[in-house]
Every structure is written in structure tokens, then in C-alpha cells.
């Protein structure tokens, strides 16, 4: 039979171990919350004095806001993550009579758009060149260069389910500085590289629109209302910030729920942007 002090020691050790687990969980939870708060701090949209917003693409999921008056002159478009539908690329190609390069290495479906010029590439954008399983990836810089578009005026739309972080982290600042507008959906809230990419983008662009995808509403992302969000980045070379407008800028009424039937979840702002 064990001595009482031995049993007592076991109890103390067990309680200490349990306390260490709880303390570790609390610290981890606090660190994760701090990361999400830092991400939200980087997602502060501004109003541009010289931007007329217009929605391009679908009425709901698949629609993106851009500064219509800052698009031309335009040489070509790049659409990453297309699947069977690319209303954004369709509208850009038809409206501005330019080709749109379509990239997707996972979904074999190819969108059709009468009157548009689509150039399909069975590859994805990533942080390096090469195959991952049977899927070929290349960098944003290489893809633009291979198509002869280096130094040309291009629009970029990106919805690649989390692959944006590595892809943009690998993109040189010089390349990002040459892109007038970048419309995209971003995914995630718990990876430190998200913060690194957002800070990199904020060096080169103004964040002009922020809309959360209501397919992804979750309290786990708080203070973010969802884990996926559409954004518009406008190059600082062409965008002029309105110093009299509030920051963060109120959300434009041109935004629409990705799902018209699910409850929406947006950050609260005082009034619609003009």
C-alpha cells in the first residue's frame, strides 16, 4: 500500500499538469486572438477621391468591385481560379476588348463567354515553379512574363482558396507595384503569413473595398466576422486617398451577399460609402 504522501504527490503532479495544459491553451488562445486583431488592423479600407466603383462579374458569389474609371488603358486580364464560371473575366474581356488569361489546374471545366477572348492555362499560381502531385504551378511573375505582359497594364483577379498567401509572398514588390488593381478573395485568419502578406500589399496598394463572404461566417474568426473576404487593392501610383473620409471606409452598397439566402455578416460601419 502506497504511503499517503506518495498519493498526495501524484495528485499534485496531476493538478500541475492539468494547470499547465490550461495555461498553455489560454496563452495560445490569446496569441491567436492577437493575430486576428492584427489582421483586422491591416484590413482598413479607405475612400479614394478618384475612384468610381463598379461591380464586375456575378450578382452574388463571383462578383468583384473595381474602380471603373481607373481601368483603362488596359492590355490584358489575369483570372486565377475559374472553374466552370468566370463572369468577372467575361465582363472585362467583352467590355474592354482584351484577352483574359484563365488559370486553373484543379478544375478541368472551362467557362464559356460569347464575345470574350479567353486564353486557358492548365496551371496554377504559386510560390515556385514545378509540379505538386499532378498539378503544375508557376509564379505570378513568371506567368505574366511568359505571356509577354511584363511592363504592360494588367488587371488581376484571384480566388484560389488559400493559395494566395504563398503566391503573393513570392511576388516581388516591383511586380506588385506595376499592377493597377488587384481584386481577390482572401481566405483564412490563423496563419501568421496572412499578416505578412497584408503588410506587403499595404506597402503597394490602397485597400478600397472589404466585403466578407457570408458562406464563411464564424465566431471562431472574431473580431473578423468570417474567414473569407473579397477585397479590392488599388495601386498607390493611381489612387488618391480622400483625407476627409472616415477610416475604415463604410462598405459600398455595390457589395452583395455571396449567398442571397444565408444570413450576412459584415463589419458595422456608420453609412454607405458615396
Where are these regions (language model features)?
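N-terminal secretory signal peptides that target proteins for export/translocation
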Residues: 1-2
